[in-house]
């Protein structure tokens, strides 16, 4: 009985913990997104070698967000962060048409990993403020998202430097993860 009351109390008043992995090709805007969410401001970034990890509190949920570098030489290390990941944020530079296929291949490779089979996928279509940014429908097509079966996914248009779309993405993520 005591356990039931305490678990109910923590559900009503406690913060829910969620482990989120944020990956994507280099220069997609992952670190800018992380610190815009954490600090509410733009920070000067350099290419991430390794990872950044921060706790972002939003709507009574503590998201532990792992921002892992995206250079091709360190992508094989991504798999070391897969364990216990509940949500996967894949960040794509909407303006980078030349590398969208490379992004699609990396995403498909990751989604085949057994440790990520239960993770929900949030795709941040970043840099939507740029004039030649791909539309969401075009990105969905080029990334092959329609072919994903047995996977909950969502594409959110974002602009990390302005903060546009970031919290809408977290809303979707928290709603999906709270169903589990």
UniProtKB/Swiss-Prot annotation:
NCBIfam families the record matches: small_GTP (TIGR00231)
Gene name, Swiss-Prot/TrEMBL: ARF4
Modification sites for Phosphoserine: 147
Name of the featured protein: ADP-ribosylation factor 4
Residue positions of covalent lipid attachment, annotated as N-myristoyl glycine: 2
Binding-site list for GTP: 24-31, 67-71, 126-129
Keywords carried by this UniProt record: ER-Golgi transport, Golgi apparatus, GTP-binding, Lipoprotein, Membrane, Myristate, Nucleotide-binding, Phosphoprotein, Protein transport, Transport
Organism field: Bos taurus
Family: Belongs to the small GTPase superfamily. Arf family.
Compartments, as annotated in UniProt: Golgi apparatus; Membrane
Cysteines joined through disulfide linkages: none
InterPro entries noted in UniProt: Arf1-5-like, P-loop_NTPase, Small_GTP-bd, Small_GTPase_ARF, Small_GTPase_ARF/SAR
Gene Ontology cellular-component annotations: cytoplasm; Golgi membrane; plasma membrane
Entry annotated with the keyword Membrane: yes
Membrane topology label: Lipid-anchor
Subunit structure: Forms a complex containing RAB11A, ASAP1, RAB3IP, RAP11FIP3 and ARF4; the complex promotes preciliary trafficking; the complex binds to RHO in photoreceptor cells and promotes RHO ciliary transport.
UniProt function note: GTP-binding protein that functions as an allosteric activator of the cholera toxin catalytic subunit, an ADP-ribosyltransferase. Involved in protein trafficking; may modulate vesicle budding and uncoating within the Golgi apparatus. Part of the ciliary targeting complex containing Rab11, ASAP1, Rabin8/RAB3IP, RAB11FIP3 and ARF4, which direct preciliary vesicle trafficking to mother centriole and ciliogenesis initiation.
A single GO BP: regulation of cilium assembly
Keyword Secreted among record annotations: no
A GO term for molecular function: GTPase activity
